[in-house]
Structure formats: structure tokens, C-alpha cells
């Protein structure tokens, strides 16, 4: 990989880790930025290197479930980005049966962290939770569609420097009597007709988790044309 010295680059998107160059079709890794700022123009002096891996694939490679968060709120701009990403998710017949509740109040996050005995407690330390709901009256594939939207939140979070973790709610129990859905429904005043698929805990990670190596991936579960024929890389 070779580095290039580039100045006065028109930028369409800037994140904490990556930039996209207007007129180009390649994503780059940022090395040095901001040389000077004028009233109507920002001059960037960058050393950049081209990446062989497409940005979307790189995001998937890096994404890990994050359960420990820094005590820092997620900026409104980033919350807007997450919501837009989820709203752009595909759905069966374009019916979009999802509804999202953005939770930032610490007291509510603490209550939601008790939605089930295990696997949700870390939500109390997250600065942001997205309750992913679906309307069965709008689509019989609401489970699939809200699951796709849940993943959109997680991938978008990774791409803008946040970490996150899926908390399964549907078909889980708060205790021996009350379902996790019923528990959350009462706290957040969710109508009976609306189902709850998941909660996505989001925030800035305390520490990064190394990506899984390619050797760790379960390629033995991949087949070619027929179930008994293993797919060879």
C-alpha cells in the first residue's frame, strides 16, 4: 500500500476514523487532518492510503459485541445517523413494520436493564438504548424486518465509532410470570398490539475487542449447491 499527499480535498463525509473523497470511488484511512481553517474553506493536509477491503466489509470485519461503555453521551448527530441507517433497512414488500424508541434517560435504561434475568444487565451502563418494535398488523414478517433493522443499528454504530450489543427481548421472560415484552411495555407505555423484538445497547466502548481472525470463522457450515458438498475457498 502506498501513501499519497493530498491537499484541498472536497469532503462529503467525515467521521472519526474515515473520510470519503468526492469524485473518487475509494474509501481511505485518515492519517493527519486539518492544517488550517478559513471562514469559508477548510484546508486539509492528509496522508492517506488506499484500502483493499471495501468499507462495508471492513465494518463487518471489525464489529464485535460491546457491553462496557464509557460514561459519555452519544451525540444527537450520531443518533440521527443511526436512525437513518435503520430506516433505510430493507423489509418485505417495503412495508417497514418497525417502530423504534430512543432511550437516553438513565433511570429508564436502568429499568430496562432488568428486562430479563441474564443478558441485559449491561444496558444500565450504556448511554443509549434503542428499543426495536414491530407491528404484526402491518406485516407477517415483522420479526425478520425488525431483526434486519437491529443489525443496521449495530453496523452503523461501528461505522461511526460506537459500540453496541443486541439484547433479545421477544420470547424471553422477566421472571417466572411476566414476559420481558410485558415488563418493557408497561415501562415505556407501548400499546398491546406492538411487539418488542430487541433492545440495542449503544455507546462508546471502554476498550476495543480484536476482530475475529478468518481462521475462527465457521466455514465448515458453508455448502455449495447441495448440503453435503462443502464450500471450498
Please provide the spans of the model-predicted regions.
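Acidic, surface-exposed loops and disordered segments
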Residues: 25, 36-37, 42-233
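Low-acidity, Ser/Thr- and Arg-rich intrinsically disordered low-complexity segments
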Residues: 2, 7-18, 22, 36
Amino acid at each position: 500500500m502506498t501513501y499519497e499527499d493530498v491537499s484541498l480535498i472536497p469532503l462529503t463525509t467525515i467521521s472519526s476514523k474515515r473520510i470519503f473523497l468526492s469524485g473518487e470511488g475509494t474509501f481511505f484511512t485518515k492519517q493527519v487532518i486539518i492544517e488550517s481553517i478559513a471562514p469559508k474553506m477548510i484546508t486539509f493536509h492528509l496522508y492517506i492510503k488506499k484500502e483493499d477491503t471495501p468499507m462495508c466489509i471492513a465494518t463487518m470485519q471489525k464489529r464485535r459485541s460491546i457491553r462496557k461503555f464509557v460514561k459519555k453521551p452519544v451525540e444527537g448527530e450520531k443518533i440521527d445517523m443511526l436512525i437513518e441507517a435503520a430506516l433505510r433497512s430493507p423489509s418485505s414488500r417495503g412495508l417497514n413494520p418497525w417502530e423504534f424508541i430512543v432511550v437516553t434517560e438513565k433511570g429508564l435504561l436502568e429499568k430496562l436493564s432488568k428486562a430479563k434475568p441474564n443478558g441485559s444487565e449491561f444496558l444500565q451502563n450504556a448511554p443509549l438504548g434503542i428499543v426495536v418494535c414491530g407491528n404484526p398488523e402491518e406485516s407477517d414478517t415483522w420479526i425478520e424486518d425488525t431483526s434486519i433493522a437491529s443489525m443496521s443499528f449495530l453496523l452503523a454504530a461501528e461505522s461511526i465509532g460506537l459500540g453496541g450489543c443486541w439484547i433479545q427481548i421477544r420470547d424471553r421472560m422477566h421472571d417466572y410470570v411476566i414476559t420481558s415484552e410485558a415488563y418493557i411495555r408497561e415501562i415505556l407505555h407501548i400499546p398491546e398490539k406492538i411487539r418488542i423484538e430487541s433492545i440495542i445497547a449503544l455507546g462508546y466502548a471502554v476498550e476495543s475487542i480484536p476482530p475475529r481472525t478468518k481462521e475462527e470463522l465457521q466455514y465448515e457450515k458453508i455448502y455449495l449447491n447441495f448440503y453435503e458438498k462443502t464450500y471450498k475457498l
